[in-house]
Amino acid sequence: MTIYLCIAFNMVNTYIDYLRLRKYWKILNQIKKHREEIKQLTNNCLKIKTTEFKKRIKSGISLDQILPETFAVASEAAERVLGLNPYDVQMIGGIVLHEGKIAEMKTGEGKSLAASFPAYLNALTEKGVHIITVNDYLARRDYESIGKIFEFLGMKVGLINQYTPISKRKNNYLADITYVTNSEIGFDYLRDNMATQIKELTQRPFHFCIIDEVDSILIDESRTPLIISGRTKTRKDKYELAHRLANFLKKSIHYKIDEKNRTIILSDLGVITCEKILKIKSIYSAQNTWAHFIYNALKAKELYLKNVHYIVRDQQAIIVDEFTGRIMPERRWADGLHQSIEAKENLQIKEETKTLASITYQNLFLLYLKISGMTGTAKTEENELISIYSLPVICIPTYKSMIRKDLPDLIFQTEIEKLKAVTEECVKMHLLGRPILVGTTNIQKSEILSQLLNQYQIRHNLLNAKPQNVKRESEIIAQAGRKYAVTISTNMAGRGTDIILGGNLEYIIKNKITSLFKPIILTGNTQYIIIDKSLKSSGNEIRDINSNILKIINLHRQNPKLTIAEFGNSLNIASKKIKSNNEYILNLRSIYIIFENIYKKYFDIESKEVKNIGGLCVIGTERHESRRIDNQLRGRSGRQGDVGSSIFFISLEDNLLRIFGGERISKMMHTFMPSVNEPIQSPLLSRSLDSAQKKVESLHYNFRKQLFQYDQILNSQRKAIYLERRLILESNEIVAWTMAYMELTIIDILNDQYLYSHRKPRDKVLKNINKIYDLLASPISLIKIEKYTFNKKTILKQLKISYDLKKAQIDKTSCGLMKSLERSLILEQIDTNWSEHIQQMSFLKEFIGWRGYAQKDPLIEYKNESYILFIKMIRTIRQNILYLLFRAEPTLDFS
C-alpha cells in the first residue's frame, strides 16, 4: 500500500512540475521573438540596451515586464562574446532563478550560463547581484568566462575570493554583479559589523543572490556557523587527563553510545568511577566542572575516527567534510571537541577560542530580499527549502534525454563479501574497457578498496582528502572517463565534477601548453622551446605552433614577472574562445586551436568507443544517509544524454542499515538470501532502503529545524545589536547616543530604587546611586541620599553639567578628542559584551534541554531566558559607558 502511495505522490509531483513548466515555455516564446529582432543590432546598440532598460525600470516598469527582452539581449551577448547559444532549458532555468526559486539542473546542463540571464536582469536595478559559489576556483572560472557577457553589455563585474585584499573588496561589492564564495561573503558581513571606522566597511545592503550548489550551502552547511574568534585560556591538563580517563572507561559498562544522535551517555557507575579517579565530589560542579571534558574525550574516542572524520597532517588534526570528502584546514570543532581529538592523537593542544561574532548560513542568506539557487540535486529536500527559505524546487528538463541505467541495489550480508564483489565487478568492467568510478564514504574505505584492486593488479587512481591525492584531483577527474580508467573516490567526485567520456580534451591541451611554457615562467629563460617529438601533426602545424611560441616568448621578455597563476588565467580565456584584443591571449589561442585540431580526432574516436561499451559505470559502495548525496554520485554518469549506469553494493553491516534499517529490513534480507556469499537484487528491498534514508533525512531535518528555531532567537538579537552598532558608526551626532545611554542608565538605577527595592537590599541601591553622584562630581553624599527625594530632572541636569565639564577637559588635549573617545568606547563595549553574550547563549542552549524533564518547553524557556540575558547585556553596555567615560583622564603633553 505504501509503495502505491509513493508512486501516486510522485505522479502528482510530476504533473505539478509539468504545469509550472508550461508557463515558462510561453515566456520562452516571447524571448525568442525578441531575439530575432535583437540579432540585427550592432554591438554598440546592444550595449546601449542596458542604459535603456535602467531608464525604463526607474520610470516604473517591473522586472517581469522586461524579462523577455533582457533575456534576449543577454543570450545574444553570450553568443557574440563566448560563442554560446543558450539552450531553451537554460533560459527556463534562468526564469526560475529570477522568480526566487531553485532550478534543479543536472550535471553538464550549463548552470553558469543559465544564471547569467537573471543576474543581468536584476543588476539593472543598480542594487547589486551576488553569484555565490562554493570555492574560489568556480568563482574565478565564471568571473573570467560568464563575466565577459556582462562587461560586453556595459556592466561592472567583481570577484571576491580569499586572496582579494580588503582595499579592493568594497569596489568589487559595488559592482553590478559580484562573483563571491559563500564563506567570504559571510566573513565580510561579520567583519563589517566589527568595523571601528566607516572606511573599513565593504558591503552594501544585500539585494539578490544566486547560489550555486544551493543544497550544499543551505542544507549541508546550515549546521556549521561562520565564526570570527579570539583566543582564550585553555586547560590543557584537563584535556590530557580526560583522554586518559576515557581510555580507562569501558563501553556498555561505564557509558553507552547513541549512534543515531551521535552522543555519549554516562552510566551511574561511569559517573562514580570518574569522580573516584579524579577525587572530586561531582563532575557536574559549577566551580570545577569536568563533565564537559569527559564527554568530549569519549566522543573523540568513539564517534570521531581518524581517516573518517579527520586526518592528521603536519601534526594537526584536520576535519574532513562528510558531504564533500574534502579537508577543511581553516575549521575546528567547537566547544573543546577539537582539543579532545588533539589529546587523543597526542598532538599539541591548541588554545581554545572565544567567539567574537558568528552567523549561520541560514540567517546570512535570509538577509537578502530575494534568494535563488541551482543544483543538480534538491528535490528530495524541497520541504525543508520551502519551510525555512520559501524556496520551491523546479526540475528543469535535460537538453537531451537521460538514458543512464540506475540498477537495483545489490545487497550482501557482510562488509567483506560486499567489497570482494565490488572488486570483482571492477575487474569485469575493466576487461570490457569501461571507465569505472567507485564512490566510497570515507578515506579508510577508499584505501581498503585500493588495496584489493592492487591484489588484482588493476591500475587505478585514488582520490581522497589526503594531500598527495588532492594534488592530482584535476588530472584524475580529467582522465576518469577514458577507456580502461578506474577511479576510486570519496565524496570528492560526487559534486561539481564533470566526467567526459573519452577524456577531458580541454584539460589535456591546457596541461600540454602549460608544460611547454612552465620553464620560461619559473626560470625566466626565454630560449626556444622544443615541441614534443611524439606530437602527431603535420609540418605546417608544427611551424604554426613554433611561430606563436616565438611571439609569446618575446612578450615574456617584456613582462618577465608573469606568474604561473596569471598564465593559467590567460590560458583559460584563450581556451574559452572569449573575444579579446590582447596579443598574448590571441597567440595562446592560436596554439590552443592547433593542439585541439591535432588531438580532437583521437578523443572523438575514444569517446565513441567508450559509448559503444556502455559509458561510465558508477559503483556506490554504501548508501549515504541522504538520498541527495547518492544522486550526486549517480549524476557523474549519463551527462548530456550519454550512456552509462549506476549501481550500489550494500551490506547489512553498513551504518545506514545497522543504525537506521530496523529489524524489518534485516529479517527480509535473511529470508531472501540463499547464502552468505550470494547477494540479493530486489526492487522491494531498494525501496525499503529508500524508506530508511527518508527516516534519517527526517531526523536530520528536524535537528536542523530545531537549530534554526533556537538560532532565530539569537538572530533577532544580532540584528538589533548590529543595527544599533551601524547607526553609531555612521552617526555624526555621537553626543546624542552618549547622552541617551547615560540617561537610560540613571533611569534604570532610579527604577531599581522605586520599583525593585523589595527585591534588592536598599543599601545596594543607594550605593549605586552614590556611585553616580561620585562620577558626576556632585556634592550630595550617601547620608544626604537617605533624606533626599529623588528627582529625575535634577539628576539628569547634573549629568549634563558634568558631561560638559568632562568634554571641555578632554578636548583641551586635542580638539574633537571627546567625540572619537565616545565612539570608540561605545563600539568597544558593544563588541565586548556581545561576545560575552554569545558565550552565555551557547551555554544556555546546551543545558536548556534539561527543562523538558520538568514538563517545560525548552524553546519557550530558552526564549524567556535569552531575553533576560539580552536586557542585562544592554544595561551593562550603558552602565560601562557611563562609568568609563567619566573616569577617562586625558594625558597632557607639556613638552
Swiss-Prot record:
InterPro entries: Helicase_ATP-bd (IPR014001), P-loop_NTPase (IPR027417), SecA (IPR000185), SecA_CS (IPR020937), SecA_DEAD (IPR011115), SecA_motor_DEAD (IPR014018), SecA_preprotein_X-link_dom (IPR011130), SecA_SF2_C (IPR044722). ATP binds at Q90, G108, E109, G110, K111, S112, D498. Keywords: ATP-binding, Chloroplast, Membrane, Nucleotide-binding, Plastid, Protein transport, Thylakoid, Translocase, Translocation, Transport. It comes from the Eukaryota. It is a peripheral membrane protein. It catalyses: ATP + H2O + cellular proteinSide 1 = ADP + phosphate + cellular proteinSide 2. Has a central role in coupling the hydrolysis of ATP to the transfer of proteins across the thylakoid membrane. This is Protein translocase subunit SecA. It comes from Cyanidium caldarium.
